[in-house]
Structure formats: structure tokens, C-alpha cells
Amino acid sequence: MKRILCIGDVALDVIAQLKEQINYGNDTASRISTHPGGQAANVACWITRTNNQAHLVARVGNDPVGFALVSDLDKYGVAHKDLMRSGRPSGVVVILVDSNGERTMFPDNGANADLELSDLPDFDGFDGVFVSGYALLDSRSRDAVLKMIDKAKIAKLPIFLDPTTTGAMKSVAKEEILKWVALMDGVLLNNEEARYLGGSDDIEIAEENLQKLTPLVVIKLGSRGAMAIHNGKFEKVPAVTTNVVDTTGAGDSFAAGFIPKWLQSGDLELSLNAGAALAAKCVATVGARPPLN
């Protein structure tokens, strides 16, 4: 069993499943639902479904949403400490999901912006660290998270980064993000993100460019599976066939499947398949978390 520290964010997802094309400036028929979310929190919750343990470092506001988010983490068995230490409201993400299951997100980081180094637990017993890119892209939490990464490196814990969407990354200079990638033992991206950071429209060239910065590069290819390269060794696996309902949280669930298996086995194929299997479960339902039942 592996124990993973997940650093970054927890939020409320407000999901609008569109029943028609958006009628700008007018009403659009949709189905609205709310779900707990946040990249780091999603990864932590999915990790608990792999017979591994997770501890979340994030913040919520002292508000009804915050109480509900903490209660939900407890139901999944995600460890945490002092999440409710911010004067800001809890984070919220509004998500539009089209008829193909693709999502467009409108994030408000909320209380997660107030992360501090003191939020870290003792590192004893941890096997690895996952860092949400949102926590680094937000200038208000960036310094604290970089200090957390420094401490994890001193403790010789493997660190994995998902830098988040290309749209979010464009708020920070690419050169700065590449410096963060160079601090990592591994980076997990989708096709678009890899081409953006890797500086090439050829995905394999982009992957090779990124591996000059970090020993492990994992690229999620959606319906075409996933690929990875580690110290020059390449592997690719197909996606697990499923009925796609909502892709929200697909990358988070993939990370939760991949990282513990990689730490256990060091086998690229096994780890990619573990990530793909968990992602298939995620996209078959609405929301970014596994069902509690």
C-alpha cells in the first residue's frame, strides 16, 4: 500500500450538461448538478479506491460549501488537517459539458489561494507527492507550494505534477512552468498540454523535449489511450472502452491510478493501464469523483 500526499485544491463543481447549443444572451436548456471537486482532492479520492491512502493539502472557506467538502473527503477516507483556515469563500468551478461529454471550465480557486507551508503534514510514511498545477498557477499560493516542493525534495519523495489545462497555463510564462516541470520526478499531461509545453505539434517530439527536463513524461490521449517515456524507455496503451458521459476528472482519476502503481512497480505498461482503467470508470458517470456506494 502506498500513501500519497496531494497538494493543491478542493472545490465545488457546478456542472451544466447542455441539452442544446449555447444561446448566448438567452436561456439554454441544461441539466444542473453539484459535485465535490478540485484537482488535488479528486486525485486523493480516486487514490482511496485503489487500496492506497491519500492526504490532501488544500483550503476551504468557513461556509456551507466548505463544511460539505470536508464531510465528503471524510466519507472517502482522505486524510487532511485544518482545511478550514481561510477568510475567503470555498473554491467553485462552473463546468459546461456538451453532448460529446467534453467540458469547459470556469474556476475560482477561492480559499485554496491561502495555502501556507504550515499546511504540510509530517512527511513520515509518505511514498510520493502529487501537485495540482492550479496551486502553482495561482500567484497567491505559488510561493507556499514551491516551498512545499522544496521540502518534499529534501525528504527525497518522488513528486508528480499535472500542470492543468493549456488555457490556465497561459496565465503564466511558459518558461516559468518549464522550471516547475524540471523540479519534478514526473509530469502528467494531455495531448494539447504536452504539445504546448513540449514546443512541438509532433507529440513524440514534444514528449522527448519534456523528458530533457524530467525523467518521466506521461501523456493522456483520451480515446486513443496513453503513452509515457521514462529515461528513454517508451510505452503506449489503448484506452479502456466505455460509454463517455462526462470527461470531468478524467485526468485526475488517471493520475490516481498511475502514480501508486508506478511507485509500486516501476513498470510503465502496468501503470498506464492502471491509469486508463480508472479514467474509464470516471468518464462513465457525471462528476469528477468515484461513486460512494
For each feature predicted by the language model, list its residue ranges.
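Short, basic and Ser/Thr-rich N-terminal targeting/leader segments
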Residues: 50, 88-91, 222
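Ribokinase/PfkB-type carbohydrate-kinase core domain
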Residues: 1-10, 71-85, 98-235
